[in-house]
Amino acid sequence: MDRRFTVFLVIALVTSIYEVLSNGNLNDGDDSFKQFDELEENPAHKYSKEAQKGFEMEEEEVTIREPSGTKESFKLPINMPPVKFSFCVSCGYRQAYEQFAQILREKYPGIDIHGENYPPGILRTVGAQVIGMVKIALIVCVVSGRSPFPTLGLETPTFFQWMLSNRLSAALMLFLFSNAIEGMLQSTGAFEIYIESERIWSKLESGRVPSPPELFQAIDSHLAIRRGGAGRFGSSSSFGIDGS
């Protein structure tokens, strides 16, 4: 096998290994999501006793509830601001967002919740787009059996000649190799939570996602501040971000 092609394969292997390691680092905070993994199997241990009263009563099929001074849900103010989640889609955080949205709607009926992808930097975005276009162009050339190098006045490299002789394997290798690079450029590891334009939690700064009680407290704190009751709660720095 040609030396240059061997070098190419080594680079592809190293890049793939780097991607695996990078994804592992980005998913270090995934342990924080494990509190939702058994939500359907054993929800009684995921929240406080007050928040779980409704779940327990439904499981026991009790039709008559005993009087309790604790309400199961929070009555939203008329001007309740929307809650926005900005997360890394390529990191697999969409399911976590959907689980957070579900428990928020259960505690705050009628709350407006939005989710969107946390955009990477401009350079990363442009780089991923360029790699995507180059990937498509190279795969088309390989599948069609045509070399673009003579058109550019260049001699076709040996490794590209091998790719033309092994079209299926080369196209698959190009696809996987370019996708690995695109994934590295687009992955941010973000899971940010906002109320209106104010960020109440940042995984990028805290290194983890909030537990449901922490998120409830952050929202209640924000609502209390809007009502002028900030003195009863901690600042936003208690919820994973600095007060600045």
Swiss-Prot record:
Annotated signal sequence range: 1-22
GO MF, any single term: thioredoxin-disulfide reductase (NADPH) activity
Keywords tagged on the record: Disulfide bond, Redox-active center, Signal
Annotated Gene3D superfamilies: Glutaredoxin (3.40.30.10)
Highest taxon listed in the record's lineage: Eukaryota
Disulphide linkage map: C88-C91
Keyword Membrane annotated: no
Pfam annotation, one family: Rdx
GO biological process: cell redox homeostasis
CC annotations in GO: endoplasmic reticulum membrane
NCBIfam families: CXXU_selWTH
Family named by the database record: Belongs to the SelWTH family. SELT subfamily.
Name this protein carries in UniProt: Putative esophageal gland cell secretory protein 6
Originating gene: HSP6
